[in-house]
């Protein structure tokens, strides 16, 4: 049976290092463990998970899934690209699917350069600071859009 809702969960640079990189900031779970937890928490959703260290690969993936059709939205942790990637911002603007920006840490409690997001204005919302739950809240936000 085909799932009624398909979502892309997309992660940017350095998120492949979760579980090893600054666990006091990002937690001790690996990205694979986070992805498995998302899939278990939302069995009614068909997920595609994607991570790249490269800006262009994230942009290509957004365009690819829109071209394929059938996706209801994107949960995006763009990592450091959040703060400077105009190209990613433009790609988010170019797709018709809703995108939720998520961050494991509360970026506003961290270094000043992390306080500015160039992608927030083209996302439907931003969730930050709840650890792994940030991803779950992002999924819930996208699923709830059908009830509005």
From Swiss-Prot:
Annotated site (Transition state stabilizer) = 21
Metabolic or biological pathway? Metabolic intermediate biosynthesis; chorismate biosynthesis; chorismate from D-erythrose 4-phosphate and phosphoenolpyruvate: step 3/7
Q: Which reaction does it catalyse?
A: 3-dehydroquinate = 3-dehydroshikimate + H2O
PROSITE patterns, per the entry: DEHYDROQUINASE_II (PS01029)
* NCBIfam families per record: aroQ, PRK05395.1-2, PRK05395.1-4
What is the recorded function of this protein according to its Swiss-Prot or TrEMBL entry?
A: Catalyzes a trans-dehydration via an enolate intermediate.
Question: Known PANTHER family for this protein?
Answer: CATABOLIC 3-DEHYDROQUINASE (PTHR21272:SF3)
Q: What is the name of the protein in this document?
A: 3-dehydroquinate dehydratase
- Taxonomic source organism: Chlorobaculum tepidum (strain ATCC 49652 / DSM 12025 / NBRC 103806 / TLS) (Chlorobium tepidum)
- The record's gene field reads aroQ
């Amino acid at each position: 049976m085909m799932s009624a809702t398909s979502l892309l969960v997309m992660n940017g640079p350095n998120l492949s290092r979760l579980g090893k990189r600054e666990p006091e900031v990002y937690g001790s779970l690996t990205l694979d463990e986070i992805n498995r937890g998302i899939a278990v928490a939302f069995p009614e959703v068909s997920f595609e998970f994607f991570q790249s260290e490269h800006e262009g690969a994230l942009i290509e993936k957004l365009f690819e899934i829109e071209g394929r059709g059938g996706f209801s939205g994107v949960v995006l942790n763009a990592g450091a690209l959040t703060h400077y990637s105009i190209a990613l911002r433009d790609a988010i603007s170019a797709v018709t699917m809703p995108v939720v920006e998520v961050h494991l840490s509360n970026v506003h409690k961290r270094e000043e350069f992390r306080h500015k997001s160039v992608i927030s204005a083209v996302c439907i919302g931003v969730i930050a600071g709840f650890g792994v739950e940030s991803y779950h809240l992002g999924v819930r936000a996208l699923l709830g859009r059908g009830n509005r």
